Amino acid sequence: MSKVGELHDAVKRGDIATLTALLEADPGLANARSEADARGTFPLHVAAEFGQAESARVLVRNGADVALLDLENDAIALCWAAFFGRPGVVSALLDAGSDVNQRNKHGLTPLGCAVGGTRGQGQKFSNATLDDWRKAAEMLRAREGKE
């Protein structure tokens, strides 16, 4: 497995020790796009999808760019966190300055992604509860997020 693959795997599992060691050895990995994921994800997108808030914080502290867009939807990681109902990651990304009103290629903001996530598609791929989506949406609204 490549170093990028190892990093993405550590983020997905929430393996902070491995994540930290990989970033110390190569800080550029914080913004390394996956070669294996056709969606074109970056480490913050992986943290968002799998609800790994501490991984997101470690990545941000090590230079991860919260404005990077995936290839599939031109979406920032905040939109992914909202879509998958991950309030801990939403909080971490908001604290890092992620744009609460950045639209993806479908015209959805992170708040729109949170609302969309509760309407079936996000629920297919996430173990989040409706309360998780509500919390994420409330955080986005509190930062003046628009749909």
Put a short name on every predicted segment:
Residues 9-14, 46-52, 80-86, 113-127:
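Ankyrin repeat A-helix N-terminal signature
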Residues 41, 49, 131:
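Ligand-binding pocket scaffold of soluble enzyme catalytic domains
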Residues 75-122:
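Ankyrin-repeat and related helical/solenoid repeat scaffolds used for protein-protein interactions
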Residues 1-6, 96, 115-147:
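Ankyrin-repeat-protein effector appendages
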Residues 2-7, 33-43, 69-76, 103-116:
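Ankyrin-repeat boundary/"N-cap" motif
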Residues 18, 54-55, 88-89, 132-136:
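Conserved ankyrin/ankyrin-like repeat signature
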Residues 23-29, 57-65, 91-99, 138-146:
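Ankyrin repeat domain, specifically the short helix-to-loop turn at the C-terminus of the second helix
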